[in-house]
């Protein structure tokens, strides 16, 4: 499907923003939509890096007051220092695994079998977790200690497997560890900031030479679309979990996994990295 670059940018920006912070795997959706739009060459891969920056900025904007409090509280607030330290601890496992094995994971696991399996298995795990859900022991992200942060970071490493979903791994991991839905979701949002920022900066460093002046307008549209849609998705998810569980996302993952299986079987989408 050949569309103008600005329209490709708008569509992919919306897809990135709407899926980045939901437990559904933005990567899987971007592969599918990028393939359908025929926007999956090196420019397309660079574009994914740019729109991810828009999604990161959206969650920073949503929590701007908390981030400012943390920044100015580091010098005198023990709670601020503890929270930032917990984010660093939670980031380290994925950072180390990504540095040591990121290329190997992309080379060997980025295929339709892996993506299908992780989508469907992830959905089944969410259903299981929600059915066994017990009263939470941790109601606020400020009550997360370094041990919990480390365990949440270990859950985040699972997102290195294509189709798993970084948000899904950390949110469901949080529920298993006794966090409330809101605490698990908000910690996942905050953990996304250093994780996605560093990953995006690294990818941009590797691919930045491909960016040309004629791409700037389309990339700007995609960035803006990702920012707005991610902001709405974050706000919407926080409202949604106030009265619902994650079961709907589980069934969506299972259905999408079947879509991946079908498109791969009939050769409609090249599910490779």
Swiss-Prot record:
EC numbers for this chain: 3.6.1.27
GO CC annotations on file: plasma membrane
Pfam families: BacA (PF02673)
Top-rank EC class of the record's enzyme: hydrolase
Location(s), subcellular: Cell inner membrane
Catalytic activity: di-trans,octa-cis-undecaprenyl diphosphate + H2O = di-trans,octa-cis-undecaprenyl phosphate + phosphate + H(+)
Main location: membrane
Miscellaneous comment in the UniProt entry for this protein: Bacitracin is thought to be involved in the inhibition of peptidoglycan synthesis by sequestering undecaprenyl diphosphate, thereby reducing the pool of lipid carrier available.
Family of this protein: Belongs to the UppP family.
Entry protein name: Undecaprenyl-diphosphatase
């Amino acid at each position: 499907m050949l569309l103008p670059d600005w329209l490709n940018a708008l569509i992919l920006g919306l897809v990135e923003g709407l899926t980045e912070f939901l437990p559904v795997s933005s990567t899987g959706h971007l592969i599918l939509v990028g393939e359908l739009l025929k926007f999956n060459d090196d420019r397309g891969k660079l574009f994914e890096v740019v729109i991810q920056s828009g999604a990161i900025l959206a969650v920073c904007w949503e929590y701007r007051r908390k981030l400012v409090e943390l920044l100015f509280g580091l010098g005198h607030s023990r709670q601020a220092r503890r929270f930032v330290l917990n984010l660093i601890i939670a980031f380290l496992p994925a950072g180390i695994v990504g540095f040591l094995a990121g290329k190997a994971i992309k080379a060997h696991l980025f295929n339709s079998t892996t993506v299908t399996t992780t989508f469907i298995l992830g959905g089944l795990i969410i259903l299981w977790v929600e059915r066994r859900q017990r009263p939470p022991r941790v109601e606020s992200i400020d009550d997360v200690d370094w041990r919990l942060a480390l365990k949440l970071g270990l859950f985040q490493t699972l997102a290195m497997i294509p189709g798993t979903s970084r948000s899904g791994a950390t949110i469901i991991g949080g529920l298993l560890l006794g966090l409330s839905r809101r605490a698990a979701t908000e910690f996942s949002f905050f953990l996304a900031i250093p994780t996605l920022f560093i990953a995006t900066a690294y990818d941009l460093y590797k691919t930045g030479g491909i960016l040309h002046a004629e791409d700037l307008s389309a990339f700007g549209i995609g960035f803006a679309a990702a920012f707005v849609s991610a902001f709405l998705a974050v706000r919407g998810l926080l409202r949604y979990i106030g009265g619902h569980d994650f079961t709907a996302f589980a069934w969506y993952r299972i259905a999408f996994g079947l879509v991946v299986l079908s498109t791969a079987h009939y050769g409609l989408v090249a599910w490779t990295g």
